Regions:
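Structural preference for solvent-exposed beta-strand-turn elements
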Residues: 1-174
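A short, hydrophobic C-terminal helix/tail in secreted or cell-surface proteins
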Residues: 175-179
Length: 179
């Protein structure tokens, strides 16, 4: 249909002209607060690879098990990992890789609120339900890096520090004297 006014004219496309949205079978679903998911994405997305030679690493791995969500991203040089407890889990343990572009969209849609976001995993797609908004993206297929073996478990060097002090140091410039 066309919309015409004396000062403007617009040609609109009907909904029927667009392809139907894919059906996402709700095999698995998880719910968490929007602010928690947003924070997880902010802390992990920087390590999502932009190199297309390994397409599966252009996204972040979501691992859901034992009432917790682990999010992992790697780019060949960096590995980012974050784990959070879940509020609601349906269907048991599961994992998937979400494209980095979809992560940035989810982050922009999520507010700094305790309202829930539901993530539903289908055979080929992922559905994010954030309030009245639905975002559907295609899962990335392939073998994601075994990050558990990439992080050494036994190391003779251990550092114990207060979180606030460590964060304060990370934002300052240290100059160490040399002998």
């Amino acid at each position: 249909p066309d919309v015409a006014q004396p000062w403007s004219y617009a040609e609109l496309v009907l909904r029927e002209k667009y392809p139907d949205l894919p059906e996402v079978e709700d095999e698995y679903a998880v719910s968490m607060q929007q602010k928690v998911l947003r924070s997880m994405i902010e802390e992990v997305a920087f390590a999502v690879s932009t190199n297309e030679s390994r397409p599966v690493h252009t996204g972040a791995l979501f691992e859901i098990a034992d009432m917790s969500l682990s999010m992992v991203a790697v780019d060949g040089f960096r590995l980012a990992f974050r784990r959070e407890k879940l509020e609601k889990l349906e269907g048991g343990a599961f994992s998937f890789v979400c494209p980095g572009s979809a992560l940035s969209e989810v982050k922009s849609i999520c507010g700094d609120t305790e309202d829930l976001v539901t993530v539903t995993l289908g055979k080929r797609h992922i559905l994010f339900e954030i309030g009245d908004t639905q975002l559907i993206c295609r899962r990335l297929e392939g073998e994601f890096l075994d990050y558990k073996n990439a992080i050494p478990r036994k190391n003779p060097i251990q550092i114990v520090a207060e979180t606030k002090a460590l964060i304060a140091v990370s934002y300052t410039h240290l100059t160490l004297p040399t002998n």
